[in-house]
Each structure stands twice: as C-alpha cells, then as structure tokens.
Amino acid sequence: MLPINAKIFKAYDIRGIYGEDFDNELAFLLGQAFVALREQDSDYNPQVQLEIAVACDMRLSSPLLKDNLIRGLVTAGAKVIDLGMVATPTFYFAVGKNNYAGGIIVSASHNPKEWNGFKMVRRGGRPVSGETGIEFLKEKILENKFMPKKQVGQVVTLENTLDEEINFALSQVDLKKIKSLKIVADAANSMGATYLTKLFSHLPQCQLTPLNFNLDGTFPAHEADPLKEENLTQLKHSILNNRADLGIATDGDGDRIFFIDNQGETIPPAIIRGLLAKLFLQDKPGAKIGYDVRPGKITIDLIKEAGGIPVVTRVGHSLIKEQMLKENLFFAGESSGHFYLNTEYGCFEYPSIMILKLLVEFSEIQEPIGQYVNRYKKYYSSGEINREVDNKETVFEKIKKSFSDGEINTPDGVSVTYPNYWFNVRGSNTEEKVRLNLEAIDETTMKNKTAEILKIIED
C-alpha cells in the first residue's frame, strides 16, 4: 500500500495525484470510513441498511478506484447503488431523487489527467466538507482500525439516472418556446458530453455541433477547465466558423458550465447568473437569490430589477449549498461557473436546467446574443489575481485599516464597497495565498484601484 499523503483531504473533497499521493487502497478505506461517518450521524437508523450511491468519471484510474470504493462500502455492510460513469450533477440528482443515505463519486473535476479524487454527499446531495465530515474521514482512514462487520452488503446497478435527470430538466420549461438555434458545445472529452448529448436529443429544432464529446481521460484536445482561456480557443473558432448563435463549455465532471456568444466572446458568469436569476424569479417571485463575494454587481442589479432578494454567499460549492438550505435560497451562482437550484430533490448544480432556461431566453430576443449581452457589460473587472503572502490574516487587517472609510463586510475574507468601485480579498483554503477580485464603474478606476490594493497586499 502506498503511504497516503494527508494533504489530499481538502476543504470540499479528497483530491491528489493517483499513484503518488494515494492508490486503490485509499478507496477501499474510504468506503469503510464513509459508512462509519453516516453511522454516527443523527439521522442514522441501525435497523435500516445504508444505501450509498457510487459513480465515477472517465479518468483512466476512475473505474478501478470505484471498484475498490465499492469493496470498502460492502465490507462495511452498506448496500451500494452503482450508477456507473456519470457527470457529477447526475450523481447528485440520483442521490436526491432516490433518497439514498449518501453517495461518493470518483472524480478530480477539472484537474490534469494525473489527478483523481472523491466527492462525498449525505442524504439529499448535501456535501460533505472539511467542517462536516472530511476531517472525520481523514482520521478514520489514517488510523485504519476498521472492525469487520458481521454481515456484508451488496451491489445493485442503476442505469436510468441520466434519463430521469434530463426528463426533470425538460419539465421545467416550455420546449415550444425554444427556437432554431445553432449551438457549438465543447465537452473537453469529459462528463458534460453525457448530459449534453441526451439533452439536445430532445431539442431537434436546435442544430448542435459537438466538439470533443468522446470520453477520454487523457484529455487529448485540451484540459477540462473552461476558466482558462486557452481551453476555449477551439470552441470560439468553431462558433465563428459555423456562424453559431451560442457556445457551451463544460468542465471535467460536468458541474461547471460556461457560455460563449455568437461573436466568440465569453459571457461573464456574473451576467449569466443575473439572467438566470431573472428567469427563476419569474417562477418564484420575491425569492432569495445567492451570489458569491467575488464582485459581479450586474447580478445584484438584475436580481433587484426582477423583484428578488440578493443574498451574498461565501465561495465554494459546499458552503453555498449549506447556506441555500439554511436560508432558503432558491437559486445561486458562482463566478466559477457553478449554478445551483434548490428543488424537491436537493440543492445542487442543474446544468441542463440552466441551459434550457437560457435557450428560452435567447429564443425570445430579436437580436444576436452577443449584442443582447453587451447591454449588461456595465462594469469593469480585474479578474481574479492571486498573490502569495506570509500571513493571510495580516493582509485582511491591512485591507480593513487602509479602506476603513468604505463599507466593510467579512463573510469570506474582506469585502469593501465604495460608490465607484468594490472589491473582495479572500484567502486560499489550502495555502498562504490571497485572491483579489475588483470591479469598478470605469476602466481607469479599476486599473488604479487594483494596483493600489496589490501594493498593500505585497508590502
């Protein structure tokens, strides 16, 4: 057995380099530790066998890790529902709709091909984070003192999960409102291809040009991270060459989604989030809508215009989902391309619903999508700028002192608001690094204030 690197236990998941930081034995131990975690939760009933869903992505190491994970769960007495190879949102949907006690998916999301990992959820798709269980799992796994169970579990296979997920998404919109649109989608040889293929098979009026839809864990075309501009080059060229109306890009496990307009320009996630907020507020007037602390004021503007209540959230899917459940937020989105909905099946990413909602919206406008979107580009953004620091807390105190005459909030790092610019400085979860995001009403202010804040951080 390869020694387990304790650094693989992150804030939101378990993730590292396969064959270097961990091997198949970790998956076996994780299966047993996860059962132990659920057995000490308040909703556990010892008279009822735990039903745990398991799935994996298309990485080369994923099937073997999944097999060992199942072996660990069964050894600990659980009934395993094997969902096979599915996207992370499909996995969440299966756990939520079928009311399983929890689930684990083998995936390293958008990380390079050498990586792999595990995302864990409880009932309803509630994420297991560092604060809510990953530390417990880490201790159990590194201790490795599991007692054999008198009765082992069993494995059943469930194959219709994707169909159920897509049918639910299709039920959320009037499909007749979606007109003939030319769309190019790049799945980066990753799991988004599964739901994109199924979804567009129900939309014959749309002409889909698929790029990199064959599942391949070596990522032959490019990395599966649409946040990096170089990974969108092929998609943007194809949009222009095909004179398409819209482009769609998904990440490695399919839980993040980006949209490109007909001019080959990335539509800022803050605008997508604002448009989706407006659309969901038509379904649920006056609802609370979440947006993360990274500046994206157009979202707040659109939420207020549509009669919603904007609510700021921390960054990170686990934290946002917990806040959505606790404060009854209907929809939320992140600058990173995660878009969440709070439904009867759980609170998690529903990319197929987001696509359908936007297709309806873009079908109703009387102008090219790029022209339509440009009206919402009111603010100038610095983008996310990372800096290594000696002490994150010291930086936060310097920021608060230097900008004490601004409106200061601290839900995640330090957020400061002035009439003509606003920014957030927050820390990395895993290293001594801070991230600056700033927005302003004009480009000069954006550049000057970004430089001023970076100087304070670096001094």
Model-found features: residue ranges?
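Gly/Ser/Thr-enriched, mixed-charge loops and adjacent short helices
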Residues: 116-242
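An N-terminal, well-structured beta->alpha segment
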Residues: 1-71, 75-76, 155-182
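N-terminal small/polar loop signature for handling phosphorylated ligands or for N-terminal nucleophile
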Residues: 40, 44-45, 51-116, 199-260
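Phosphate-binding and adjacent anionic-ligand microenvironments
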Residues: 284-459
